[in-house]
Curated annotation (Swiss-Prot):
It catalyses: guanosine(26) in tRNA + 2 S-adenosyl-L-methionine = N(2)-dimethylguanosine(26) in tRNA + 2 S-adenosyl-L-homocysteine + 2 H(+). Residues 6-73 form the Trm1 methyltransferase domain. Pfam families: TRM. It is an enzyme of class 2 (transferase). This is tRNA (guanine(26)-N(2))-dimethyltransferase. Dimethylates a single guanine residue at position 26 of a number of tRNAs using S-adenosyl-L-methionine as donor of the methyl groups. It comes from Pyrococcus woesei. GO terms for molecular function: tRNA (guanine(26)-N2)-dimethyltransferase activity; tRNA binding. One of its GO terms (biological process) is tRNA N2-guanine methylation. SUPFAM superfamilies: S-adenosyl-L-methionine-dependent methyltransferases (SSF53335). It comes from the Archaea. Keywords: Methyltransferase, RNA-binding, S-adenosyl-L-methionine, Transferase, tRNA processing, tRNA-binding.
Amino acid sequence: MSMELFEVHEGKAKVLVPKAKTIYDSPVFYNPRMAPNRDVVVLLLNVLKPKIVLDALSATGIRGIRFALETPA
């Protein structure tokens, strides 16, 4: 089974997401409307500098990928 993919650029992250008519039709859930929320969380993590962060509701994993790329180790 082949899927048509498109590349999403968000912050420093680049991920491939299946094309779908709606976000609910895709086998992988990616909600582009939440990008501003992820931007704010990355900014907050850079200010608070927690030692551990959990992305418990991961779908595409973009939030966790951004945490890894855009916050201090």
